[in-house]
Amino acid sequence: FGRTQTFHREAGGEFSGEITGVTDGAGRHFRLVLTTQALRAEEARQKATSGGTEPSAFPDTQPDYTEYGRDNGIRLSAVWLTHDPEYPENLPAAPLVRYGWTPRGELAAVYDRSNTQVRSFTYDDKYRGRMVAHRHTGRPEIRYRYDSDGRVTEQLNPAGLSYTYQYEKDHITITDSLDRREVLHTQGEGGLKRVVKKEHADGSVTQSQFDAVGRLKAQTDAAGRTTEYSPDVVTGLITRITTPDGRASAFYYNHHSQLTSATGTDGLELRREYDESGRLIQETAPDGDITRYRYDNPHSDLPCATDDATGSRKTMTWSRYGQLLTVTDCSGYVTRYDHDRFGQMTAAHREEGLSQYRAYDSRGQLIAVKDTQGHETRYEYNAAGDLTAVIAPDGSRNGTQYDTWGKAIRTTQGGLTRSMEYDAAGRVIRLTSENGSHTTFRYDVLDRLIQETGFDGRTQRYHHDLTGKLIRSEDEGLVTHWHYDEADRITHRTVKGETAEQWRYDERGWLTGISHLSEGHRVTVHYRYDEKGRLTGERQTVHHPQTEALLWQHETRHAYNAQGLANRCIPDSLPAVEWLTYGSGWLAGMKLGDTPLVDFTRDRLHRETL
């Protein structure tokens, strides 16, 4: 598209030949501030002196060679935006990002544009570059221990699950602090090493097969069912997926490896067309709806207009940075968007004089939303960036408290408080409602819910099969079994040994009927579709419990207009109900047969006004 990224190298001095500037394709210029080991050492001494502390050991030089190869000691210290064509007089007064380094030249800290430290790293005293701890701002520190070969043997999470890793020649055993164990069996060497078998904490086993170059060929689940994948020999792109029941999906690509066609297991096809530049120009959905994309700039991959299946056109304009500036709908009504220098949307101006304004703090977090009438909603955050409070325009305050891992432990709305408790795995184990009643939860070793005791003291239990599907539920003695076909679609449900509901599907996998018993009578809803997979009919039937004789039926048919929108509903023995629409499908009125029922008048935002 003609976009160019230019790198500027220092012509002379201690940074000679190093990249110290970048100009992106939109014309913005970024200055890369570099430092040497000597500069960092001097800065550390000055900082210690100004703080009245004893300077720590910070050598002026480093070895020319380390375990990782040649090292000239030069590091990136900060990135500044120094030229912005859209905001030439409003450049940031601080760097976009800043980095801190250890005396050995290891990355120690990352600071965002507000000068808030967002990441920190700690390294082994003996082994250069071996990270032994890291943390995100406001979160606990995660620590690591290593064996003599430099492999992680422990991951220590003070407020969550910790893990140990045991390495053997062809398998790795992972055990968490709840004593759950997984074993990963591997084959191959170097970059071709792959996990071919996984023993899960419940004893189940899943397996994977790969071709000679390490691409996935097949996966076998815990029930022994295999899904096959067929990658293209040259590109490696998946061309076919065959599920355990023998159904297949196919994928086709052009010479740019872009998807041009995808056929699902039901035989319906998605098609895409591209121009010479690789831009999407047309997409045909499985139901036949066509969306077209138009471009007015040969140097942009962003569309200037889209035409939907109804023929309605929506146009867009974009900034040089790819930010959406305007959207004009099918009726010619325009919505405009404003952005700040960081690319965040600051205002949306809609028809009817409606605008919404957004404000952000120095970290880029949304702190206020105000409408045209001056009604303002404000937002507050903690150091980790979790949303802690929403203050409505009337001054009412809804708050949320979090644990150290960022999980909500208490929410307050309208003066009422709800609290949550978690186990070490981060699973909710106790929920306390606004009136002080409790619901408790229990899980199996694969984190699946197996028991729930509600506010009323009633206990429900759940059982799953090897692949995780619910197969049995118990509700205070009421036992329900769930049954599935080879494609994992539910086929029937039994309650106390009696069939309660049944689901039927056709050869394409579409639902064709749901039935249940009501006072001994079989009540069924049958579904019919056209070749595009759209619902065309629903027929309800009631059969005699002994003779299966048809006692009652009622059918409703559905029709679509030439643009693919549902526009008619035709009940038995009644005139058709028709929806009248305009544009992309906005409802303008309804009629029963030839008799108008209702008309809608809409404003420039397509809202009902009459």
Which ranges hold each PLM region?
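Extended charged/polar low-complexity repeat regions
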Residues: 1-610
